Amino acid sequence: MSKANLVIYVISDSIGETAEQVAKAAVSQFKTEDYEIRRFPYINEKRQILEILEEAKNENAVIAFTIVISELREFLIEEAVHLNIPYADVITPILSAMESVLEIPAKKEPGLIRKLDERYFRKVEAIEFAVKYDDGKDTRGLKQADIVLTGISRTSKTPLSMYLAHKNLKVANVPLVPEVAPPRELFEINPKKIIGLTTNPVKLIEIRQERLKALGLKNEANYASMERIFEELEYADGIMKRLGCPVIDVSTKAIEESAGIILEIFKEMGHKFSNGK
């Protein structure tokens, strides 16, 4: 087999995707399709660098690398110069430019962008979880949830679930209605991961009346009557006492404040979530 006209050795202490994309962008500026890219990810030892360069010296090679560990980077450059192999340090120049502007040193930890991507996908997963297990639609999610919220209608269960999902937490919520028995799963899970939500009846009647107006319904509906609200609150209070779960009054609290209280409760209990926090 004949040699390629150009062999680009992509070397990285992470997966090497960044250096490979830069190499592809660079080679696209030339009228040639006779090239090959060889990627060497997770390089963290001098021995590995020597092995790669020993191979590269016999090719029409260029090295493109993203290595943030100073000792390894300097070793690679020294050996490439010694073997007369052209190289391009893809990441150091922009790190140096940013350090001069920010006036703080770069962390120089391999694979940080990958960790950011992982956090993003965990967040997406948590949001999808909150949607799937909202309003008791599927009680199988209660055992998988980091947090389970429960309370009567209009006690901020859904917005709180979504807010906490954006913090990478899997949250399910269960409505409490006097005419409907709570799902058995609610009593089978650890009560320490359940948070009960309650509210002031006067505040709740205002919220429910506004909800009825938005739906084009009359305020006389039982849903917004004080008698019905007292009945629901009393019923929910009984369920929460049976569960033995912490209860938060959300009457005068913004979603962010209620979420902060919930997280503080779990912190005090020393609870660890599925996201490791």
Swiss-Prot record:
Superkingdom is Bacteria
What InterPro entries does this protein map onto?
Kinase-pyrophosphorylase, PPDK_reg
Q: Which GO terms describe its molecular function?
A: ADP binding; ATP binding; phosphotransferase activity, phosphate group as acceptor; protein serine/threonine kinase activity
Q: Provide the catalytic activity annotation.
A: N(tele)-phospho-L-histidyl/L-threonyl-[pyruvate, phosphate dikinase] + ADP = N(tele)-phospho-L-histidyl/O-phospho-L-threonyl-[pyruvate, phosphate dikinase] + AMP + H(+); N(tele)-phospho-L-histidyl/O-phospho-L-threonyl-[pyruvate, phosphate dikinase] + phosphate + H(+) = N(tele)-phospho-L-histidyl/L-threonyl-[pyruvate, phosphate dikinase] + diphosphate
Question: What role is this protein assigned?
Answer: Bifunctional serine/threonine kinase and phosphorylase involved in the regulation of the pyruvate, phosphate dikinase (PPDK) by catalyzing its phosphorylation/dephosphorylation.
What EC class is this? transferase
- Which keywords annotate this record? Kinase, Nucleotide-binding, Serine/threonine-protein kinase, Transferase
Q: In which residues is ADP bound?
A: G151, I152, S153, R154, T155, S156, K157, T158
Origin organism is Alkaliphilus oremlandii (strain OhILAs) (Clostridium oremlandii (strain OhILAs))
Q: Which NCBIfam families match?
A: PRK05339.1 (NF003742)
Provide the E.C. number(s) assigned to this enzyme: 2.7.11.32, 2.7.4.27
What is the protein's given name? Putative pyruvate, phosphate dikinase regulatory protein
Q: Which family does it belong to?
A: Belongs to the pyruvate, phosphate/water dikinase regulatory protein family. PDRP subfamily.
